[in-house]
Amino acid sequence: MTDEQIYAFCDANKDDIRCKCIYPDKSIVRIGIDTRLPYYCWYEPCKRSDALLPASLKKNISRCNVSDCTISLGNVSITDSKLDVNNVCDSKRVATENIAVRYLNQEIRYPIIDIKWLPIGLLALAILILAFF
């Protein structure tokens, strides 16, 4: 298809999954702006083999310097201290490690002086300074 045919088809079918790379949701574009990584480098519809991509977008996608990894958590069990992580990032490394579980320190430390006395204390200090100088 030519670029004109792609745009004509996608203008008429904006909800077609093959056109989502040309017409992404505003939230997808916003994520790309926030992460400073163009959406077409990581957005799944742009990676589809049947995606309708004009030549300029294909050229931009070819410049993406991104390692796209799919990481999924498998069996997560806190009682056995076992964490199974599946990392599909072209690595063949399989690691089995025991993870020690400990509770977070939730000790609450209160200030020595209540904050409501701060303005009164500052006012008293100012009066003392003015009285003696």
Curated annotation (Swiss-Prot):
Virion surface side: 1-111
Assembly mode: Part of a stable entry-fusion complex (EFC) which is at least composed of proteins OPG143, OPG147, OPG155, OPG086, OPG094, OPG107, OPG104, and OPG099. Formation of the viral membrane is necessary for the assembly of the complex.
Protein name: Protein OPG104
Membrane-related topology note: Single-pass membrane protein
Transmembrane residue ranges: 112-132
Keyword Membrane assigned: yes
Family according to the record: Belongs to the orthopoxvirus OPG104 family.
Keyword line: Fusion of virus membrane with host cell membrane, Fusion of virus membrane with host membrane, Membrane, Signal-anchor, Transmembrane, Transmembrane helix, Viral envelope protein, Viral penetration into host cytoplasm, Virion, Virus entry into host cell
Pfam family, one: Pox_G9-A16
Organism this protein belongs to: Variola virus (isolate Human/India/Ind3/1967)
GO biological process: fusion of virus membrane with host plasma membrane; symbiont entry into host cell
One cellular-component annotation, GO: virion membrane
Subcellular location: Virion membrane
Function, as annotated: Envelope protein part of the entry-fusion complex responsible for the virus membrane fusion with host cell membrane during virus entry. Also plays a role in cell-cell fusion (syncytium formation).
Highest taxon in the source lineage: Viruses
